[in-house]
């Protein structure tokens, strides 16, 4: 009985396969014309087909004409129908009476059509001789078998046969009517339009990349079959067949590309469009890839050579005994299509670089960034980030070696960073949009006869094994025994590992690849590119902060699905991407100041043509220093404070170029506020740092402020000018000026931390708590405890009174509004 079962099963499988093969072969026969018939047979066959087709068309038209003039049609209408019929009959009578005129017009159109056909064939032949005669066979065949071109030629030849048959009817004195005239006129117009279309297509074929359109069409057909998820894709034979077809298409794309790149013609625009088409193909493929079963023969095999250091003793013994090398393993290569497209685009990218078509490279990078969302959704984010890094390495080298314009250098650096930013944004959006249904599977799909997966997290061997086990349980026990939580746990593990992989890729991009780009550009004195990368740091931090928050939340949530501890999950890492990035950022901010200052000085007269990165650098530097005071990071503060005065004074001088042109009297107070803001910010930060040194008891803070002031501010009467400007600020009218809100935020951040410091002792004094310590400075500037204002004065006044006044003559010293310095000097 068992033997009979296997025979029947074999017959059934053979029959099903033969049916599939027949349908597939039949479909190919309809799409591709047989190539093994002779030229004469092909011509006769086409003539016969056109002749038979036109016989049916003409017969149908003649029948319509006869119906229009028949008496029976009068029964279906009233006077209007009769008038229409009379008009048709009069037209038909005139046509037959003057059939010579119609025959002459038709003969003229036939002649014109013949001329069109001859001209077009001549154009095709000249194009072939110029572009394709010496091309590889695969390329010339693509040109020869162009579907649209052949259809246009077929349209002209069909019309010629149609017209000749009508002339034959006229010679035979067979009546023709208005319907035949209308159809003939329409076909004549079609010929004219076809000629215009074909002429335009001839010019299109002057770009030899244009012949690849049919290859892309075949690739998209293959992807369409992969998406069907039914008969063909579920059969191993057809999976392998589609893979072979795709490989042939990729071979043609490679050959076309290599042939074009070897020519000396300038084809940068065509190469750029070709690269974009490849990215679009990859985009479509990633839309369908997650639906392909993990064990499909669509995926190619890859050889992994075994290593001696981790080989089994039996393998090593066998190799030593036979004198051979270790063997190899064969695994599925799930990235074979991506790798082939990558090779093609790498050659194109190198061509654009060699031809100095940097604008094309920049546009292509913009297209590549659009691939980020699909990479995240399809689980290919690791490959995508690695590919971006490869491009970054190549472009880093190019920026160093080639003479870019400043705009191109800045644009290339920015696009590289923006590509990584797109990954951060798309990962966050993907995780935010993913609901709990990703891990809560549909149990009915596991109880069905066929294995179906609704999510890419179901497309794994262990999930397939659970399905097969449940099918066995149902057959033996009549019901499912495997608990639902166990199935959800297995699926949740794959989701968990996918998020971990995203975390590692974000960490690489943020804390290694982007800083490496900035470092490389700095080392090679490419200040414009480095400046742009540094300017993006705050945006990178913001996007990384949001992404890591969602990552951490999802990882913690997924760990709740781990019920069976014998199934080992990877440990949840300490999600600290932003903290690591902050350390790098603070350590490199001085380099940002350096490259930005150099760029501004070198392009002082044309700086307004570029983004105001000097202003961004100054503002973010202040933010770093404020945060360093709050977090008591002296080393960070010390390394960045030395750049503060130079950057702020440089930016003040740049702003003066524009402010000096403002002559309106009513705007002078605002002009003064903008001009003095850099001095306020420097003095404010210096004052808070000195105050923090006084409160914390760490003298390094005060020594740093005093040392830098003596070194930089006391020379050339700079300190005196500082005091004059600060005095002007003290005496100005109360109002909201530029950056006042920002200054208030800085003050609130610092004073909130300082007021809660345990080193400040308080004592009760009637209804208040006042400072109870030995510091003359704190006794002079601190308000009562829990007051709205922590300080009695502005922070910049602390710097002016306590630090600046030390180095000034008595008549040049700064005086505060309420004279608190008198108490301090006592």
Each predicted region: which residue ranges?
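Membrane-anchoring hydrophobic segments
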Residues: 1-114
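Binding/recognition "hotspot" determinant
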Residues: 7-8, 12-21, 141-143, 168-826
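Generic, low-specificity signal for short hydrophobic/alpha-helical stretches with a mild N-terminal bias
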Residues: 91, 95, 121-122, 181, ...
């Amino acid at each position: 009985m068992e033997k009979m079962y296997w025979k029947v099963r074999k017959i059934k499988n053979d029959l099903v396969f033969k049916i599939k093969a027949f349908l597939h072969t039949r479909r190919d026969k309809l799409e591709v014309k047989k190539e093994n018939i002779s030229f004469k047979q092909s011509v006769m066959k086409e003539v016969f087909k056109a002749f038979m087709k036109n016989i049916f068309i003409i017969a149908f038209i003649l029948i319509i004409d006869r119906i229009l003039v028949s008496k029976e049609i009068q029964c279906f209408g009233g006077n209007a129908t009769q008038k229409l019929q009379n008009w048709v009959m009069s037209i038909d009578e005139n046509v037959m009476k003057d059939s010579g005129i119609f025959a002459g017009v038709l003969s003229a159109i036939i002649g014109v059509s013949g001329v069109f056909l001859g001209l077009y064939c001549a154009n095709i032949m000249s194009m072939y001789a110029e572009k394709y005669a010496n091309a590889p066979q695969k390329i010339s065949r693509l040109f020869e078998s162009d579907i649209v071109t052949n259809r246009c030629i077929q349209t002209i030849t069909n019309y010629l046969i149609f017209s000749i048959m009508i002339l034959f009817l006229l010679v035979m004195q067979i009546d023709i009517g208005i319907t035949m005239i209308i159809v003939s006129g329409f076909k004549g117009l079609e010929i004219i339009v076809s000629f215009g279309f074909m002429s335009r297509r001839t010019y299109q074929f002057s770009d030899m990349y244009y012949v690849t359109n049919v290859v892309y069409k075949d690739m998209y057909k293959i992807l369409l079959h992969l998406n069907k998820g039914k008969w063909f894709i579920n059969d191993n034979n057809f999976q392998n067949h589609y893979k072979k077809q795709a490989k042939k298409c990729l071979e043609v794309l490679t050959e076309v590309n290599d042939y074009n790149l070897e020519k000396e013609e300038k084809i940068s625009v065509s190469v750029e469009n070709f690269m974009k088409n490849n990215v679009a193909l990859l985009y479509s493929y990633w839309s369908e890839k997650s639906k392909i079963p993990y064990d499909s023969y669509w995926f190619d095999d890859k050889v992994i050579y075994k290593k001696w250091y981790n080989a089994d003793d039996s393998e090593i013994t066998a190799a030593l005994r036979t004198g051979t090398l270790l063997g190899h393993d064969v695994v599925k290569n799930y990235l074979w299509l991506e790798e082939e497209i990558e090779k093609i685009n790498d050659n194109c990218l190198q061509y654009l670089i060699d031809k100095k078509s940097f604008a094309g490279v920049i546009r292509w990078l913009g297209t590549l960034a659009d691939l980020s969302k699909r990479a995240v959704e399809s689980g290919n984010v690791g490959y995508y980030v690695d590919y971006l890094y490869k491009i970054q390495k190549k472009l880093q080298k190019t920026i160093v070696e080639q003479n870019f314009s400043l705009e191109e250098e800045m644009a290339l650096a920015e696009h590289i960073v923006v590509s990584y930013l797109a990954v951060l944004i798309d990962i966050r959006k993907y995780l935010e949009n993913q609901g709990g249904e990703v891990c809560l599977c549909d149990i009915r799909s596991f109880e069905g006869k066929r294995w179906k997966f609704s999510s890419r997290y179901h497309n794994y061997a262990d999930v397939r094994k659970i399905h097969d086990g449940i099918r066995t349980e149902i057959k033996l026990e009549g019901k499912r025994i495997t608990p639902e939580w166990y199935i959800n746990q297995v699926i949740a593990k794959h989701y968990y590992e996918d998020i971990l992989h995203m975390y590692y890729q974000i960490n690489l991009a943020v804390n290694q690849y982007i800083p490496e780009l900035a470092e490389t550009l700095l080392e090679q004195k490419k200040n414009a590119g480095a400046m742009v990368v540094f300017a993006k740091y705050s945006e990178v931090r913001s996007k990384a902060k949001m992404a890591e928050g969602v990552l951490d939340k999802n990882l913690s949530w997924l760990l709740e699905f781990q019920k069976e501890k014998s199934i080992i999950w990877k440990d949840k890492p300490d999600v600290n991407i932003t903290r690591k990035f902050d350390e790098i950022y603070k350590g490199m901010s001085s380099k940002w100041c350096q490259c930005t200052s150099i760029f501004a000085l070198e392009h002082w007269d044309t700086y307004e043509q570029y983004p105001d990165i000097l202003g961004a650098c100054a503002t973010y530097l202040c933010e770093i220093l404020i945060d360093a005071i709050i977090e008591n990071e002296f080393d960070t503060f010390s390394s960045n404070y030395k750049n503060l005065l130079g950057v702020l004074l440089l930016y003040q001088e740049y702003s003066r170029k524009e402010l000096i042109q403002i002559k309106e009297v009513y705007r002078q107070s605002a002009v003064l506020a903008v001009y003095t803001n850099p001095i306020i910010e420097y003095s404010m930060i210096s004052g808070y740092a000195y105050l923090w040194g006084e409160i914390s008891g760490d003298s390094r803070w005060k020594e740093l402020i005093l040392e830098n002031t003596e070194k930089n501010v006391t020379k050339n009467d700079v300190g005196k000018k500082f005091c004059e400007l600060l005095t002007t600020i003290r005496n100005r009218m109360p109002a909201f000026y530029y950056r006042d809100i920002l200054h208030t935020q800085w003050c609130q951040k610092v004073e909130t931390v300082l007021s809660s410091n345990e080193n400040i002792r308080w004592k009760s004094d009637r209804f208040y708590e006042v400072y109870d310590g030995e510091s003359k400075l704190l006794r002079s500037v601190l308000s009562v405890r829990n007051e709205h204002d922590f300080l009695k004065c502005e922070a910049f006044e602390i710097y002016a009174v306590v630090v600046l006044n030390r180095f000034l003559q008595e008549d040049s010293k700064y005086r505060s509004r309420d004279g608190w310095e008198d108490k301090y000097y006592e």
